[in-house]
Amino acid sequence: MVTIIPLIKIKMENNHLKYQVVKEQYLKFLSSQEVMSEPFRDKLGQLKNFYLPISRMIKEEYTKEKKTKLIGLSGGQGTGKSTISKILKIILKENYGLETVIFSIDDFYKTLQERKMMSKNKSALFLTRGVPGTHDTKRLYNCIKKLKDQKFKKFKIPKFDKSIDDRLPKNKWLKVKKKPNIIIFEGWCIGVPPQKKKDLIKPINKLEKQKDTKKIWRLQVNKELKKKYKKIFNLIDKLIFLKVPSFKYVFKWRLLQEKKLRITGKGKKIMSNIEISNFIMYYERLTKHMLKILPRKADTVISIDKKHRLKSIKFN
């Protein structure tokens, strides 16, 4: 006698097996990222309520045309962009068989020498990496186009070492040998539009008041957003925004990042509290602008609560 197993039952069993694999890989990854003083909370709840729905949205976007899709992941410093990107990569691979490449806008910072030249020709503030204008936008645009190209050829993505404040040599760049289905492009200013001119008049903090008295720096940053960065952001198929409660938590969570680096011993150059406070002033204007604009502009908004936990998700 032949036993016929309904297709729906087979599908349910396969889905259950996939979930078990995803759960195992997910928990294993989180375990590797934890430090004793800051354990991850509600791990399975976060998987079910956030990571699985987001990965499903990405998969559905890919299924529309079966072409490489660029997913922008935007959020202030310390919001967890790198961790979220890696978790999504695990789920997309194990659940849907999709190959994912992750890279950060940080890896496309101009070299130290290039920023020194820019600081002489434009504003001394451009020596400090971070704001639009301090990235190699031509290289970044070409990289995304190559990854999305149907006639894909293997190539390398730059790597930037923040401990030396410079780009690494080519032999240490990320090798992409296979055409990806999904590209996760993460960074603190991904998808941010330029500001209105009237919003640039008043300095937003001590840095701008004392070191950008003629508005040269912030006007140039805005100019970069209007042209070069807009061209790059237009390539994004879906934009995910990590919304923080307020800018003060960017400082708080950046302190947490430095604390973790001290504990794990991964940081070669750890910043003091005063150094962090001064450093994030460079990011303040655009971070506050993003908090006003991106909750309406992004395709998906993930709100993060004051305790650094994923609080809610909204698909626009």
What is each residue range found by the language model?
Residues 78:
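Walker A (P-loop) phosphate-binding loop of P-loop NTPases
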Residues 146-186, 191:
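Phosphate-binding/switch loop-helix module in NTP-utilizing enzymes
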Residues 101, 110-160:
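Conserved nucleotide-sensing/catalytic segment adjacent to the nucleotide-binding pocket
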Residues 81:
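Conserved lysine of the Walker
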Residues 8-25, 41, 48-51, 188-316:
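Conserved NTP phosphate-binding and transfer environment spanning the P-loop NTPase/kinase superfamily
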Residues 84:
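Hydrophobic positions on the alpha1 helix immediately C-terminal to the Walker A/P-loop
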Residues 53-64:
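Pre-Walker A adenine-sensing motif
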